Regions:
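Short, surface-exposed beta-strand/loop micro-motifs that present aromatic residues
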Residues: 97-103
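Active-site beta-strand-loop-beta-strand hairpin of nuclease catalytic cores
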Residues: 103-113
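Basic, Lys/Arg-enriched alpha-helical interface segments
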Residues: 1-95, 116-166
Length: 166
């Protein structure tokens, strides 16, 4: 079995991971579907999902793409040529889940926001989730820059040792 090419990271804020909370709040069939799709599709394809029915780039939100889950976990696994565990529950209802993501670094996907589009199909809800994903990405980028700024020496001199950097 091959190793996933992409690492999935949950955006964290105030000690919580909103997409993980979303995942855990779903009913069992949808939770299994999203977990199977994240680990067997997104972790292998990363931004490549945007070249398929699994994803698309979000207009007006640079760097953010939408990961789309439309099948139950058993279907996801079968489509990937993987065995389906007997304990996996197959769903007969509609599955229409969305997770908004950002790719960065060396093949890392940051999971920013998610919602059940089947439950709330309105454009208003979709727009609100995209806005939330954009805000989280902005905060995440700012947090990534802070440590880098703190680590840079001022005027080429390390404050700790008082020596010039090479």
């Amino acid at each position: 079995m091959r190793t996933p090419e992409w690492k999935l990271e949950f955006y964290e804020e105030k000690g919580r991971a909103p997409v993980l909370d979303f995942l855990r709040g779903l009913d069992q069939i949808k939770e299994q579907a999203l977990a199977a799709a994240l680990s067997n599709v997104l972790a292998y394809e990363g931004i490549g999902v945007c070249r398929s029915s699994w994803g698309k780039w979000v207009q007006g939100a640079p760097g953010i793409f939408e990961f789309r889950v439309r099948h139950d976990a058993a279907t996801v696994l079968r489509e990937r040529g993987l065995p389906v565990p007997k304990e996996l529950r197959e769903g007969s209802g509609e599955i229409l889940l969305r997770v908004f993501c950002h790719a960065h670094g060396k093949k890392v996907v940051l999971l920013l926001a998610g919602y059940d589009k089947g439950k709330e199909p309105s454009m208003k809800r979709q727009s609100a989730e995209i806005k939330r994903a954009k805000q989280r990405l902005t905060r995440w980028k700012a947090a990534q820059e802070r440590p880098a700024k703190q680590a840079r020496p001022i005027g080429g001199v390390h404050k700790r040792r008082g020596k010039r950097r090479p």
